[in-house]
Amino acid sequence: MVRLKKKHFIAILLTIFVATEVSLRQFWGFANAPLYYESQSYEYMARPNQDGYRFGNHYHYNAYSQRSEEPDSTKVIVLGLGDSVLFGGVMTDQDSIATSLFSAETGVQMLNISAGSWGPDNCAAYLKEKGLFGARAMFLLVSSHDAHDNMDFKEVVGKHASYPDKQYLFAWGELIGRYVYPRTLGRLLGGGGILTTLTSRC
């Protein structure tokens, strides 16, 4: 009888674990964050050819790591260059970022060439490497602090939570390691410690 109850208890725990894992993935996009790569020219950028959902919002990056559809040579192209304001992040749906709204309303394709904390020098370095994509015009939108934030090539990709280079194996691992632990025990203990190291591999 005791052994049977133990089996039932384990089965219930496994069911809860699996159900929560599926829910975190399907409804919240855990273990599905946009990934980044390092660049020797412009520090970092979102990896190319990504498409997914995160916290209910759609994100899409084309073959040039732009948060846009592929450049369309049949349309007038304008380059939108900037930092997190233009980038939008995962809390802004693909259709709601400024460049998507502009493209939808004008018929002009505005390519979104941006990343969090990018400054003018990041944008210039990207264009020097990738080209101008046949653009007729371009504009730069950066906040006051990013306008003077020169590239220093500090390692942030895979080091800082905002710039992951690989997915968590389990949504549970991301929930605990990236959100719950740093905001609770991590603050009390003054750092990531062993738990963060372990959950980053989960």
Each model region followed by its residue ranges:
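Short, Lys/Arg-rich N-terminal segment immediately upstream of the first membrane anchor
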Residues: 1-5
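Hydrophobic membrane-insertion alpha-helices, especially the h-region
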Residues: 8-25
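Interaction-surface signature
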Residues: 30-37, 120-202
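Conserved beta-strand elements of the Class I
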Residues: 77-81, 111, 138
